[in-house]
A protein has these predicted regions:
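Glycine-rich beta-strand-centered segment in the early N-terminal region that forms part
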Residues: 20-34, 49-105, 140, 145-147
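NAD(P)H dinucleotide-binding glycine-rich loop of Rossmann-like/cofactor-binding domains
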Residues: 57-71, 99-179
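C-terminal hydrophobic helical "lid"/dimerization subdomain
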Residues: 256-260, 299-351
C-alpha cells in the first residue's frame, strides 16, 4: 500500500509499504480521510519532536524512523480480528490515536493522557492515517454513527478542544476569550457554543480567521494589531474580564495577554504546544490569583464529541477548506499551510 512516511526534518516521502495484518483484538481500517495537524507541521519544520529518529527507537512503540504520519483520520472497517463481534464490515469509524502504558502513576490514577510514556499513532509509530490502511486495537476504535468520514477526520482535534474546555471547568453562561483562531482555537469556539458558554471573544490578527471565528459562533472578534485585546474584553464583559481565556497561539505575549484579559480569579488554559520554553511575568498572575491550567490531548472525549455531532449540536464541515490526494501532500498540504495566507483551516488528505 501507499503511505506518507517521515524520514526526518523536511523529509516526507510517499512510499510503497506492506499492508498491516489484522491480529486478535484489532481492527483493520480503510482510511478515507486524514487531516494535517499543526503537530505534523512542527515535525516537518523542527522535528523530530514526537517522532523517533533512525537511531533511537520510541520507548512506547519500539519503532524508529521512518514512520507513517497522520493521527486525525476516519474510514471504514475493512477487516476484523476473529474475536471482535461489535463492529461491522464497512462501518464508519474513527480512532483515538493515543498509546499509553497503563502502568505509570498518571495511568493508574486514570489520567491516561498524561502517561509518562505516551505515544501517538501517526507520530511515534503504530501506523498512521496517511496510509491506505491501518490496524489498531479495538479499544481505540469509535463508531461514527451518522457522522461522515470527512467530519470524522476532525473528531481527534475536536476531542482536543472538548478536553481543553473541560479543563477550564467553565460554568454555563460564563464568558470566554479565545486567543488564536487556528484549527484548535476555532474548534474550541464551536465546543464552547455547543456546551452553553456565554459571551465568546476571539483575538486573532488574520481577517480571514476572524470571519471564520464569527461563523463558528464567536460573539466578538478583536484584531490585536489595532486594539488592546485585554481592554476590549473588559469592555465586553462589564469591566471584569473574561471568566476563562484559552491560549491557542503558542506565543509568550499572547499568554501574557490571556492573563491580562481574565477577571480576578479567572482561568487561563494553555492549549498551544510550544517548540521552545515560554516566559511569563508572574506578577499579574499572582496579583489577580489567576489559575493557569495545562491541557494535553483528551481523556474520554471522543465519544461525547461523536454524540454532539450526531445530535446536531456540533458542525465541522465549514472548517474543511481543502481536499487533496496523497501525492499532493507536501506541496498542496504542508507547504500550502506553511506558505499560505492563513485562510486554510483544515486540509484533508485522501490516501
Amino acid at each position: 500500500m501507499r503511505a506518507a512516511r517521515f524520514h526526518g526534518r523536511g523529509d516526507i516521502r510517499i512510499e510503497e509499504i506492506p499492508e498491516p495484518v489484522v491480529r486478535p483484538g484489532t481492527v483493520k481500517i480503510k482510511v478515507d480521510w486524514c487531516g494535517i495537524c499543526g503537530t505534523d507541521l512542527h515535525e516537518y519544520v523542527d522535528g523530530p519532536i514526537f517522532c523517533p529518529t533512525p537511531e533511537e527507537p520510541h520507548p512506547m512503540t519500539g519503532e524508529t524512523a521512518p514512520v507513517v504520519l497522520g493521527h486525525e483520520f476516519a474510514g471504514t472497517v475493512a477487516e476484523l480480528g476473529a474475536d471482535i463481534d461489535d463492529l461491522s464490515m464497512g462501518e464508519r469509524v474513527t480512532v483515538e490515536p493515543r498509546l499509553v502504558c497503563r502502568s505509570c502513576p498518571p495511568c493508574l490514577a486514570g489520567h491516561h493522557n498524561s502517561c509518562d510514556r505516551a505515544a501517538t499513532i501517526g507520530l511515534a509509530g503504530g501506523g498512521g492515517g496517511l496510509a491506505e490502511y491501518i490496524v489498531v486495537d479495538r479499544e481505540l476504535v469509535f463508531s461514527l454513527g451518522e457522522v461522515t468520514t470527512e467530519a470524522g477526520a476532525l473528531i481527534e482535534p475536536l476531542a482536543v478542544a472538548h478536553h481543553a474546555v473541560g479543563r477550564a471547568e467553565i460554568a454555563p453562561g460564563a464568558s470566554a476569550a479565545v486567543f488564536g483562531a487556528g484549527p484548535i482555537g476555532l474548534l474550541i469556539v464551536t465546543v464552547l457554543k455547543a456546551t452553553g458558554a456565554g459571551h465568546i471573544s476571539v483575538v486573532e490578527p488574520s481577517a480571514g480567521r476572524r470571519r471564520r471565528a464569527l461563523d463558528a459562533g464567536a460573539d466578538a472578534v478583536i484584531d490585536p494589531l489595532v486594539e488592546k485585546a485585554d481592554e476590549r474584553i473588559r469592555e465586553l464583559t462589564g469591566g471584569a474580564g473574561a471568566e476563562v481565556a484559552f491560549e491557542c497561539a503558542g506565543v509568550d505575549s499572547v499568554l501574557a495577554g490571556c492573563v491580562a484579559a481574565v477577571k480576578a480569579r479567572g482561568t487561563v488554559v494553555n492549549v498551544a504546544i510550544r517548540s521552545h520554553p515560554a516566559t511569563l511575568d508572574m506578577i499579574p498572575l499572582v496579583l489577580k490569583e489567576v489559575r493557569l491550567v495545562g491541557t494535553i490531548c483528551y481523556a474520554g472525549d471522543h465519544q461525547p464529541v461523536i454524540d454532539l455531532l450526531n445530535a446536531g449540536k456540533l458542525s465541522v464541515d465549514r472548517f474543511i477548506t481543502r481536499r487533496i490526494d496523497l501525492d499532493d501532500l507536501v506541496e498542496g498540504g504542508f507547504q500550502a499551510l506553511l506558505d499560505g495566507t492563513g485562510d486554510d483551516i483544515k486540509i484533508l488528505v485522501r490516501p
